[in-house]
Amino acid sequence: WCHNPELIENEQQLIVSPSNCIGCGHCVEVCSAHAISFGDAGVSIDRSRCTVCLACADGCFANALRPVARLMTVGEVLAEVEKDKGFYDNTGGGLTVSGGEVLAHAEFAGALIDAAAARGISSCVDTSGFGSSRALLDLVSRPGVTDVLFDIKAVDDEVHREFVGVSVGPVLANVRLL
């Protein structure tokens, strides 16, 4: 997912693609919050009413409504990862923890890395480097971590501020730390 802004929030989110809507009305029927309506542009959601229960997305065969993220436990994520264990074993690959920004979810990522390592799956930490140095060191020093990817958007502070909105200073400090 590579530092996608829609994955930074710690909650489920719903994406609307009105052009995919076939007008079946199923989403309106199953929405107990009465947050979905149809207009000239297709389906739309009143975000102030939506509870993000995902009942509408579960029944949307046209993918006009779909979850962009959902809350999962370490066990649920690991169950998905383990489906590809044979591939990892044959290629030397493993789990890549990213985000949003992995440092924003360091405690969860650490628990996932540990659980994967206990099952013989190595991990790679993929980060923009913008986060806690302590969290970064904690993650990359775990026994299951074999690789670290740093996605540095720009090394010039002015350019970084223009495109990312923050100074590159903390990012470069974290790179030097490793």
Predicted regions and their residues:
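Iron-sulfur cluster-binding cysteine motifs and their immediate structural context
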Residues: 1-10, 26-45, 55-70
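Glycine-rich, flexible loop/turn motifs
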Residues: 11-12, 68, 84, 159
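Thr-Gly-centered strand-to-loop micro-motif
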Residues: 16-18, 45-46, 98-99, 127
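Cysteine-rich micro-motifs
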Residues: 19, 47-54
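Mature, well-folded catalytic/scaffold domains that follow N-terminal targeting or propeptide regions
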Residues: 21-24
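FAD-binding FR-type
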Residues: 49, 70-76
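Conserved AdoMet/S-adenosylmethionine-binding subsite of the radical SAM
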Residues: 75-178
